[in-house]
Amino acid sequence: MSDQILGVIPARFASTRFPGKPLALIGTKPMIQWTYHHASLSKSFHRLVVATDDKRIHDVVLGFGGESVLTSPDHPTGTDRIIEVAETYPNYGIIVNIQGDEPGMEASLIDGVVGLKTKHRNWEMTTAAVPFTSAEDPKDPNKVKVVFDNKGRANYFSRSPIPASFKGEAKYHRHLGIYAYERDFLMNYNQLPPSDWETVESLEQLRALQNGSTIGVYLSDKANLGVDSPADLEVVITEFKKKGLL
């Protein structure tokens, strides 16, 4: 069981809502460079690579001094892309999936998720969550909710508000899209039986949960700024200016 940790940033050029998103400029740098830079501030990784099926992204990453791997364009999910990269680097015992469209990724969040995974090597994977703010609507299906037990193990992920506010006001936690996998579990992930939870919720992590795997949840106090649309990009640019990054 290797203690080496590999960070992987999947980046696709094709996007229905925002084509070419990884190369969208934030100031003078493309988004993927910001994501790579902030992820590289983490103390957790022994190696950090971008996984992309597009040579334009690949060349940009190499151009700013990052490491990139060209992957098959035919992967049905991001996890499949991560698996291909993990096969290329067989000496890493923990594989971390970092979203390429989160240019403001906090190193402390990465370290929290990875720290939880290294503490519990018997847990198949770990992820993160953050409490909902008063401005957020738990009924928004694009904000995935997670409930977890007193030991920090996920019970369920849903696009619906969970738990229900039947008697009193429930406390909601929003799932954050970062995962740390135990290598052996990741490499056998596609052998897991299909999950009806996964199908109806359209949430890939439910396949692992329904098949009895343990998903640890690191509770963060703040969320990363994600980019799903050009409007989101403008929000990130404004926040980066406030932080003095631009």
Swiss-Prot record:
It is found in: Cytoplasm. It catalyses: 3-deoxy-alpha-D-manno-oct-2-ulosonate + CTP = CMP-3-deoxy-beta-D-manno-octulosonate + diphosphate. Its main location: cytoplasm. One of its GO terms (cellular component) is cytosol. Its EC number is 2.7.7.38. One of its GO terms (biological process) is lipopolysaccharide biosynthetic process. Pathway: Nucleotide-sugar biosynthesis; CMP-3-deoxy-D-manno-octulosonate biosynthesis; CMP-3-deoxy-D-manno-octulosonate from 3-deoxy-D-manno-octulosonate and CTP: step 1/1; Bacterial outer membrane biogenesis; lipopolysaccharide biosynthesis. Gene3D superfamilies: Spore Coat Polysaccharide Biosynthesis Protein SpsA, Chain A. GO terms for molecular function: 3-deoxy-manno-octulosonate cytidylyltransferase activity. The keyword Magnesium does not apply. The keyword NAD does not apply. InterPro entries: Cytidylyl_trans, KdsB, Nucleotide-diphossugar_trans. Keywords: Cytoplasm, Lipopolysaccharide biosynthesis, Nucleotidyltransferase, Transferase. Pfam families: CTP_transf_3. Activates KDO (a required 8-carbon sugar) for incorporation into bacterial lipopolysaccharide in Gram-negative bacteria. This is 3-deoxy-manno-octulosonate cytidylyltransferase. It comes from Leptospira biflexa serovar Patoc (strain Patoc 1 / ATCC 23582 / Paris). The lineage of its organism: Bacteria, Pseudomonadati, Spirochaetota, Spirochaetia, Leptospirales. The gene is kdsB.
